[in-house]
Curated annotation (Swiss-Prot):
Function: Serine protease inhibitor that inhibits trypsin.
Gene Ontology MF, one: serine-type endopeptidase inhibitor activity
PANTHER family, sorted: KUNITZ-TYPE PROTEASE INHIBITOR-RELATED
Entry's localization field: Secreted
GO cellular component annotations of the record: extracellular region
Name the record gives this protein: Kunitz-type serine protease inhibitor B6
Keyword Secreted attributed: yes
Length: 84
C-alpha cells in the first residue's frame, strides 16, 4: 500500500474513532471519579469528565496527587471518557 493510502486509512480510522460514542461499559472507571485538585497549591487549568452531564468540564489542579480523571485537553477527555 502506498504512503498516500496509509494516510487515508489512518485518517478514516481516526474519524471513525471520533464519531463512535463510548458506552458506559467501555468507559474507564476513573472517568466516574469527582475531580480532585490534589495536595499541592498550583492553579493549573485541567479538564475532567462529568458523569452527570456527560461533558468534559474545567477544574483547577494543584499540580500533584489527585486522580486519573484529569486531562490536559477536552479532546483527550472525550477520547478517553466520551462526552461532549
Amino acid at each position: 500500500m502506498s504512503s498516500g493510502g496509509l494516510l487515508l486509512l489512518l485518517g478514516l480510522l481516526t474519524l471513525w474513532a471520533e464519531l463512535t460514542p463510548i458506552s458506559s461499559h467501555d468507559r474507564p472507571k476513573f472517568c466516574n471519579l469527582a475531580p480532585e485538585s490534589g495536595r499541592c497549591r498550583g492553579h493549573l487549568r485541567r479538564i475532567y469528565y462529568n458523569l452527570e452531564s456527560n461533558k468534559c468540564k474545567v477544574f483547577f489542579y494543584g499540580g500533584c496527587g489527585g486522580n486519573a480523571n484529569n486531562f490536559e485537553t477536552r479532546d483527550e477527555c472525550r477520547q478517553t471518557c466520551g462526552g461532549k
